[in-house]
Amino acid sequence: MDLNWGVNNMSEIYQSGLYKMVDKRIKTSCNELSDKSFGEIFQIPKGMNYGERRRDLFKSLVLQTLFRPRDLINLLKTLQKEINKSGTFNEHVYKETSKKYSNWLVNNEIANEINPVLRDDYKYVIELLRLCGARDLSVKSFTERYNSVKHEFRLSPLDLLEFLYNVGIIENTWKGKGGKYMHRSIFRNEGDFDRNLQLRIIPAVWNGLMV
């Protein structure tokens, strides 16, 4: 049986399986927090700027993951270690946590998943992803960057995009009603890759590529 951990709409994060998992783990691990609300536990220090306007801390943490339990648990453990090491929670701790987690996600977790498939292509795919940058781009723009890499890939541009989407490295993105950007990924909503939409490297993966 496959459990669905996806979160189609971030406004529903507090009804999700990820939220329930973390809430239960905190309450069973820390008796002193059993009477505190989830919002109190994840409260941001007043005046702290961590680059996420109008978004609460838990949502920001979830968006750094591939919406898989092991990703979120590892991120929270990393955050806990950094807080214990510094004795406080501030912008520096948040950034250091994000840096270490993203490095683990890309260079350990994802690398172990894609290396057996990509083999000799692996380092060139990493080069290609860095050429793509953090912004949205079309399949045509991706193909142009693909062709600029001095290497003969085993997968065609579209096949490579399908592969990268299915392992959670890229996601589809488009403007919805009112100009709001929408995102769809294999782990978040289980939607298929749409070549007619724009795409982008998932932020957590991009951060890991830059470490």
Where are the language model's segments positioned?
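Winged-helix-like regulatory helical subdomains adjacent to P-loop NTPase cores
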Residues: 54, 63-154
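Short, amphipathic alpha-helical interaction segments positioned at domain boundaries
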Residues: 184-211
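Short, Lys/Arg-rich nucleic-acid/phosphate-binding segment
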Residues: 174-180
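A long, hydrophobic alpha-helical segment
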Residues: 40-64
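The catalytic "switch" region of P-loop NTPases
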Residues: 1-49
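C-terminal accessory extensions appended to soluble enzyme cores
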Residues: 118-122, 164, 181
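Short amphipathic alpha-helical interaction segments
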Residues: 150-167, 172
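Generic, well-ordered alpha-helical scaffold segments in large soluble proteins
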Residues: 21, 25, 75-82, 128, ...
